[in-house]
């Protein structure tokens, strides 16, 4: 059944039959509009996008390409094309320093790059492999950055902590840097889980990881882990009761309220209910809420503007809620929307980006 899982993942990474949307998407009774951006065509699901302000951002895909925009997504410049590399995640500390993770070998076809993490110090013009102490990291699926405020010689300053996890299909590994990415350490999480998909750190020490219990999808449950010691140890805070399930992506619009997408790969087409895990106590406990009763809506990305208003991407469409997940309405976010990033500028204005087969901007 592991091969069944790989085939399904490959379909949503390389299928060329995805529909294209070009019409602005205006949420009902909402000022926010999702607008499709013009980008280089890609025959499948692209995985991550990151912005440091309203204008400057980057996205990556499985063709080993990294693109940058300086005008809020109106135009994109290809900064890197690395054959044999499948980029899976990207994050930037500032306009110069950034990191891109790869899914690694022995998962998708034609992937030969064994380097799991790359770093740029010049805004993406050049990228170099990151060295680290600890066990070999096969691949990464997510990166999160925490800025810790402290007093430096009488002035407010920041320390930057960077966390990364992976991968889909196993093995499960964790990477961390506490010095702005200058040095890294890795550790195995195979005793806690078998797959890792996303990470959200609330501060230097506390956070959660989206995981799965088994690399065999037929036996896998969705799993959420929590740490209070910067990833040195983890405890289970949620596990689904059904087979063929994993978690995928996480969104915390506030300190206490958080949401995690639950993926179902059950081949039984009569199993239709899609679910999301929700916490109201900062990730200590979780409850399942229903998304939609359709078997063709496997979940991917999730992003919330506030505690109640959020979006989910699925294989077939997007969904929006304005009441904390009690009800959902179908919207167009393109297909296989894998990552939704929601930001606020200095004036409190909300903007965001989503990436899947296509890129969309929320403003």
What do these predicted ranges mean?
Residues 1-23:
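Bacterial Sec-dependent N-terminal signal peptides
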Residues 24-38, 64-80, 116-133, 175-188, ...:
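Asp-box/BNR beta-propeller loop motif
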Residues 40-63:
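Beta-strand-rich domains and repeat architectures in extracellular enzymes and scaffolds
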Residues 46-48, 86-90, 138-145, 194-200, ...:
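Repeated scaffold domains used in trafficking and secretory/extracellular systems
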Residues 56-58, 97-100, 157-164, 205-209, ...:
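Entry beta-strands of beta-propeller and related beta-repeat scaffolds
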Residues 61, 101-104, 164-167, 210-213, ...:
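Recurrent small/Gly-Pro-centered beta-turn motifs in extracellular repeat architectures
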Residues 105-109, 168-171, 214-217, 265-269, ...:
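Short glycine/acidic-enriched loop and turn motifs that connect beta-strands
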Residues 341-363:
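Blade-level signature of beta-propeller repeat domains, shared across WD40, Kelch, NHL, RCC1
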